[in-house]
Amino acid sequence: MENAGQDLVACLFQREDTLQDAAAVLSLSVADVTEAERMLRAFVNTAPADEGRKTPRITFCYTVNKAYLVYRLPQTTLFKQLTSFVEPTLDVYAAFYGGRLLLAPDEDSLSHYIRQLDKGEVLNGAMAYQTGMDHLSDSYHFMLMADFDHVFRQSENHVRFVPDFFLRNADFFRNFTLFVQFACTDGVVYPNIF
């Protein structure tokens, strides 16, 4: 953890094939990417072999601009513990992108996320995102942005944390994007909802 940065972002997003479950990625800032990648590669290369698995521990995610190394970590419940919004899996895939360590429960989620970033298909600049962000503080400890229509279409595993009030009135709320932000000052938590 000596190379970990100060922030962690969890992303849940729709795959191109909308019949599949949502994709999930954790993005952790990294202070020294070169050292962190060296340590991760050493960890992956010295981990015990997985019985009966033929998939390589290190593969590539190819984009138009670059090939990114993708590491299959030894099986663990880490991703599930950190997010609690994915189907149970023991797999965790990792890659470095733009000074961040990306973690995902499957290689497809990770590759899709990297390709979207590489193409510049991000929320910054999108009108709905910018409108919501204009009403929030620049300083916060936690922020959530959710398109209720997409949230309500997810499996029960993904919507179990949505308050009953929103679920009972889903026909109304599916037309909204929710922005929630929490800031902590002097031990007091201040919510900001837009």
Question: Where are the regions that the model predicts?
Answer:
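Signature of soluble extracytoplasmic/periplasmic domains of secreted precursors
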Residues: 1-194
